[in-house]
Amino acid sequence: MSDIADRVKKIVVEHLGVEEDKVVESASFIDDLGADSLDTVELVMAFEEEFGIEIPDDAAETIQTFGDAVKFISDAS
């Protein structure tokens, strides 16, 4: 797993309180990991802070899964 994926996974585990093995590429933050809309906003803010990037609102809406987050951050870095 890439450094970005490891860091994203750590943020997801810490913010959502889920088991690390549940955070897989296809895991939906809402459907699979139990996040609500506020959790997803907090995740995006945590990703922005961790990686020093800005995620526009329209892009944030497309980040639905762990894999989406890793891809967006990889492309933005």
From Swiss-Prot:
Pathway: Lipid metabolism; fatty acid biosynthesis
Gene3D superfamilies hit by this protein: ACP-like (1.10.1200.10)
GO cellular component: cytosol; membrane
Keyword Lipid metabolism belongs to the record: yes
Record's comment on post-translational modification: 4'-phosphopantetheine is transferred from CoA to a specific serine of apo-ACP by AcpS. This modification is essential for activity because fatty acids are bound in thioester linkage to the sulfhydryl of the prosthetic group.
Limits of the Carrier domain: 2-77
Coiled-coil stretches: none
GO biological process: lipid A biosynthetic process
Entry-annotated residues carrying O-(pantetheine 4'-phosphoryl)serine: S37
Domain of life: Bacteria
InterPro entries, alphabetized: ACP, ACP-like_sf, PKS_PP-bd, PP-bd_ACP, Ppantetheine_attach_site
Subcellular location: Cytoplasm
Keyword field: Cytoplasm, Fatty acid biosynthesis, Fatty acid metabolism, Lipid biosynthesis, Lipid metabolism, Phosphopantetheine, Phosphoprotein
PROSITE patterns registered for this protein in UniProt: CARRIER, PHOSPHOPANTETHEINE
Alphabetized GO MF terms: acyl binding; acyl carrier activity; phosphopantetheine binding
Pfam families hit by this protein: PP-binding
PANTHER family recorded: ACYL CARRIER PROTEIN, CARRIER DOMAIN-CONTAINING PROTEIN
Function field: Carrier of the growing fatty acid chain in fatty acid biosynthesis.
Protein name as it appears in the record: Acyl carrier protein
Species, as recorded: Roseobacter denitrificans (strain ATCC 33942 / OCh 114)
Lineage start: Bacteria, Pseudomonadati, Pseudomonadota, Alphaproteobacteria, Rhodobacterales
